[in-house]
Amino acid sequence: MARAYVSLGANLGRRDANLESALALLRREALVEVVAVSSFRETEPVGLVDQPRFLNAVAAVETDLSPRELLERLLAVERTLGRTRDGPRFGPRTIDLDLLLYGDAVVREPGLDVPHPRLHERRFALEPLAELDPGLVVPGRGPVSALLAELD
């Protein structure tokens, strides 16, 4: 069984309800156990900044799914909650689920990059990761605490 970390974000609709709905759907997934959830944080948008503020969190999950299978489940949850991908990249969204880490695996495949390739640049993901596991190490990058310090 692997420990994976999934980021959750929303900036459209009832953001808190969107995150809670995503967590509820994840909890119903076979072979996925949500073992911890960070606090919810309001954050500024990244990339396309002229949009509403985000509500972000990270969930720690235990899973027997492969990284690809877990990603497919995350995308299915997004679709169930009305996520469409026809808008601008980094644009507003009802829900956004990203696979940040999958144990100590490093995966580079079409459509799947683990650890998330921009994780080390994203305070909105690093802070909740540090809340869940202060000693967590991002493969190929180093401790989450050091990555956060580099952003200061």
Enumerate the language-model features and the residues they cover.
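N-terminal beta1-alpha1 ligand-phosphate binding loop
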Residues: 1-32, 37-42
